[in-house]
C-alpha cells in the first residue's frame, strides 16, 4: 500500500538505538521533510557507555592511571545470524565509524571460551560439535540429548507456539532444558517457561516442524532460497567489509556502543532533525487528526503527518489504543560494573564470561558475568589494558519476578550481592578491594515475548493499518527481536518504506503469520 505522498512532517518517539537509527535514515531518505526526535529521557536509551578515570598501584609497584570505558547496556555485536547483521554493519559504515570497529576473530579466546557456572564451578561450553565429546557434565548431557533427539517424534498436531522450556524439555530432556535456561538468562533475562519459542528461537521451531527433528533441520538448513539470496546480496553490498566480517566471531566499537548512538544523534541533528531529549521531549498524548497526528508536548501541540514510535509497547499503549501492546511482560536487569587492580589472568580464565542456569549458584540473583577485559579487548582501556580487570555482573531478570523475588528500589542495593557473588566464584577477590563499582538498575529493559507473540503482532499490524491509515509505524525491541541488530533492522525497514512513499506499520513481517 502506498500513501499519496511521502510524509513531510515526521515525529520519531524514543531516542534509543531504534529511534536514532530511524531519525538518521529518514533525514537522508527524505531530506526535505521536517523530522522531530522526541524522548522524555536521555539520548541513547539502554545503550550507555561510561568513561571513568582510575589510578592505582599495580602488584609490581607501578603507579598506573588512565581512562576506561564501562558498559551499562549492550556491548558486542554479532556479524551473522540474519538480515539485521548486514544492516547494522552498513549503518556503522555509513555513520563513519568503520575505523572504530574492533573485531574479535573466531580464533580468539573470547570466541572459543564461554562458560556455565554450576555448583561444581565453571564449565566450558562446547564451541563445536566435536568438543561435545570431551568430558564435562554439561557436554556429556548435551551429547546424549543431541544423539537421541532425531528419534523423538514431534507432536501431532504440531503446536503453533510453545514456551522455550516446554520445547527443550520435550525435545532434549530436563537436563538440557536446565542448561538452556542459562542462555535464555543471557539473551532475554527471562524465565524460559514464559518465553515464546517461535519468537525467540524460531529456527528451532521451523527445523522440527519441517524435518521432524531439530538436529536434522539444522544440518539441512531451514532458511528459504529467497532469504539466503537476500542476505548474500546484503553482504555483497558491503564489499570488502562484508568479506572481512566472515572471520569475526563478534565485534565491538572503540569507545563503546555509546559511540554509535552519539554519532547517530549528531548526524541526525546535522541533517536538520529537531532533537528534543529530556522534559521538553516527553510526549503526553497522541491524537489522530484529519490527515495527520497531533502530539502533545510540554511546549504545546506538534502537528505531523506520520509518527514512528520507538517507545516500549507498554508506553505506547498509554498514547494509542492498539491491541496487545500490554500482552508481554518486561524484565528488570541489574548491571554492576566492577574494576579490580589485578590483571585478568590473576582472577579468571581467558574468555567471554559465564552464564548461570536457573538456581545454580544464584543465591544473589546473578544471571551471569562478562569478562569485559578479555571479552572485548581494544575497546576503550588504552594503556591500562591487561593491567586491570573489568567485570560486569548481570542480575535480576526472572529472579525479580517470575522466580518469586522483587527488584530492589535502588541500584546501590546491587553492590553487596554482586561483590559477594564474585568473591565466591573467584577466591582471589576475597582480599582485593575493587577500584570502581558502578551499579545500574535497568527497569523493564527487555521484553519477554510470551507464547503467541507472532499472532498478536499480526493483529496489531492489522489494527495500525486499519485505524491509523499510514500515519503510524512501530519499531524497537518490543516487537521483532531484542538484539541491537534486530532493532536496527526494524528501524531501517520503516525508514526505507516511508522514503519510498509506502504506508508501513513496521510489522509487515507478521502480516501472514499463521
State the predicted function of each range.
Residues 27-61:
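Glycine-rich FAD pyrophosphate-binding loop
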Amino acid at each position: 500500500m502506498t500513501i499519496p505522498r511521502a510524509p513531510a512532517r515526521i515525529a520519531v518517539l524514543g531516542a534509543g538505538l531504534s529511534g536514532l537509527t530511524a531519525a538518521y535514515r529518514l533525514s537522508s531518505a527524505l531530506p526535505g521533510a521536517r523530522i522531530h526526535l522526541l524522548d522524555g529521557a536521555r539520548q541513547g536509551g539502554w545503550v550507555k557507555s561510561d568513561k571513568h578515570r582510575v589510578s592505582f598501584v599495580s602488584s609490581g609497584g607501578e603507579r598506573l592511571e588512565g581512562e576506561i570505558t564501562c558498559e551499562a547496556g549492550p556491548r558486542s555485536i554479532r556479524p551473522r545470524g540474519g538480515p539485521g547483521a548486514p544492516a547494522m554493519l552498513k549503518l556503522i559504515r555509513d555513520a563513519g565509524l568503520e575505523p572504530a570497529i574492533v573485531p574479535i576473530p573466531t580464533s580468539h579466546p573470547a570466541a572459543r571460551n564461554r562458560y556455565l557456572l554450576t555448583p561444581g564451578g565453571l564449565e566450558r561450553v562446547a564451541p563445536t560439535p566435536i568438543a561435545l565429546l570431551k568430558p564435562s557434565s554439561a557436554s556429556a548431557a548435551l551429547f546424549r540429548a543431541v544423539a537421541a533427539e532425531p528419534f523423538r517424534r514431534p507432536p501431532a498436531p504440531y503446536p503453533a507456539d510453545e514456551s522455550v522450556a516446554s520445547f527443550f524439555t520435550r525435545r532434549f530432556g530436563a537436563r538440557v532444558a536446565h542448561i538452556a535456561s542459562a542462555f535464555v538468562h543471557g539473551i532475554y533475562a527471562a524465565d524460559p517457561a514464559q518465553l515464546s519459542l517461535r519468537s525467540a528461537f524460531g529456527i528451532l521451531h521451523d527445523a522440527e516442524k519441517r524435518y521432524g527433528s531439530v538436529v536434522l533441520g539444522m544440518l539441512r538448513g531451514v532458511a528459504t532460497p529467497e532469504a539466503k539470496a537476500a542476505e548474500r546480496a546484503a553482504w555483497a553490498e558491503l564489499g570488502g567489509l562484508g568479506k572481512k566480517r566472515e572471520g569475526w566471531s563478534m565485534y565491538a566499537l572503540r569507545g563503546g556502543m555509546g559511540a554509535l548512538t552519539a554519532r547517530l544523534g549528531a548526524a541526525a541533528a546535522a541533517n536538520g532533525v529537531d532533537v528534543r531529549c529530556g522534559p521538553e521531549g516527553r510526549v503526553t498524548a497522541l491524537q489522530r487528526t484529519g490527515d495527520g497526528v497531533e502530539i502533545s508536548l510540554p511546549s504545546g501541540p506538534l502537528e505531523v503527518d506520520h509518527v514512528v514510535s520507538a517507545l516500549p509497547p507498554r508506553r505506547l499503549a498509554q498514547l494509542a489504543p492498539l491491541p496487545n501492546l500490554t500482552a508481554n511482560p518486561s524484565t528488570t536487569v541489574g548491571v554492576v560494573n566492577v574494576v579490580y587492580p589485578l590483571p585478568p589472568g590473576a582472577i579468571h580464565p581467558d574468555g567471554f564470561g559465564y552464564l548461570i542456569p536457573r538456581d545454580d549458584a544464584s543465591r544473589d540473583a546473578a544471571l551471569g558475568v562478562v569478562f569485559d577485559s578479555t571479552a572485548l579487548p581494544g575497546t576503550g582501556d588504552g594503556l591500562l589494558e591487561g593491567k586491570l580487570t573489568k567485570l560486569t555482573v548481570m542480575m535480576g531478570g526472572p529472579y525479580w519476578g517470575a522466580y518469586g523475588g522483587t527488584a530492589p528500589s535502588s541500584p546501590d542495593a546491587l553492590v553487596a550481592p554482586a561483590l559477594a557473588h564474585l568473591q565466591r566464584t573467584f577466591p582471589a577477590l576475597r582480599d582485593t578491594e575493587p577500584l570502581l563499582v558502578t551499579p545500574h538498575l535497568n527497569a523493564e529493559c527487555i521484553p519477554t515475548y510470551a507464547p503467541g507473540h507472532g499472532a498478536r503482532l499480526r493483529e496489531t499490524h492489522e489494527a495500525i493499518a486499519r485505524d491509523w491509515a499510514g500515519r503510524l509505524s512501530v519499531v524497537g525491541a518490543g516487537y521483532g527481536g531484542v538484539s541491537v541488530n534486530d532493532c536496527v533492522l526494524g528501524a531501517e525497514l520503516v525508514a526505507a518504506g516511508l522514503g519510498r512513499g509506502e504506508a508501513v506499520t513496521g510489522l509487515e513481517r507478521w502480516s501472514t503469520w499463521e
